[in-house]
């Protein structure tokens, strides 16, 4: 977890950060929408989700929805380029993390529930669905992105459907 103040930035800095986020989204989204048009529905539903690029070292986040930023309390500049491990903390179950790592390493899809940490250190149970986005090039299917949807739930036994 990160050690930092819990204060919100001044409005002018927050506005600049929001402008930078929207500029980033405008640059990143078009090629993603081309291969996975459902992303538009996720955005319209204010869903919490991220998109990562497994072709880059560490499978970094290349897109974070406004819902993700709201859920986690992190600004866009503290999210992009990082792996989602920054949401883990001392109460996060290593066995669940290993399941996620195995699925991602094998290009597979997975649904798990784990304890995550917001920027302010508060915890939330997170039902996570991770799915690979693939496209066929010259007769070969290539893994382009992972989309990770996050649904905060009340407890590990809650599947998020209530």
Q: PLM features: residue spans?
A:
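Eukaryotic basic, amphipathic alpha-helical target segments in cytosolic regions
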Residues: 46, 72, 76, 91, ...
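Conserved, structured regulatory domains from eukaryotic proteins
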Residues: 98-108, 134, 146-158
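PAS-family sensory modules
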Residues: 1-56, 138-139, 143-162
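PAS-family sensory domain signature
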Residues: 71-75, 80-85, 90-92, 98-100
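PAS-family sensory domains
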Residues: 54-55, 95, 103-108, 115-125, ...
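Conserved long hydrophobic alpha-helices within structured protein cores
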Residues: 37-50, 76-79, 119-126
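Conserved hydrophobic beta-strand signature of PAS-family and PAS-like sensory domains
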Residues: 59-62
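N-terminal capping loop/helix in small sensory signaling domains highlighted by a polar->aromatic N-x2-3-F motif
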Residues: 65-68
């Amino acid at each position: 977890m990160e050690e930092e103040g819990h204060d919100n930035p001044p409005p002018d800095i927050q506005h600049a950060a929001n402008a930078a986020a929207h500029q980033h989204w405008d640059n990143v989204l078009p090629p993603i929408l081309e291969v996975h048009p459902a992303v538009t529905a996720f955005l319209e539903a204010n869903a919490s989700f991220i998109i990562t690029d497994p072709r880059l070292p560490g499978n970094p986040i290349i897109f974070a929805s406004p819902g993700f930023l709201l859920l986690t309390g992190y600004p866009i500049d503290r999210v992009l380029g990082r792996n989602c491990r920054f949401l883990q903390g001392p109460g996060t179950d290593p066995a669940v993390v290993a399941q996620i790592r195995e699925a991602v390493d094998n290009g597979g899809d997975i649904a798990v529930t784990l304890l995550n940490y917001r920027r302010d250190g508060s915890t939330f149970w997170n039902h996570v669905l991770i799915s690979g986005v693939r496209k066929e090039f010259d007769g070969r299917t290539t893994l382009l992105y992972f989309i990770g949807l996050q649904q905060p739930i009340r407890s590990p036994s809650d599947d998020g459907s209530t």
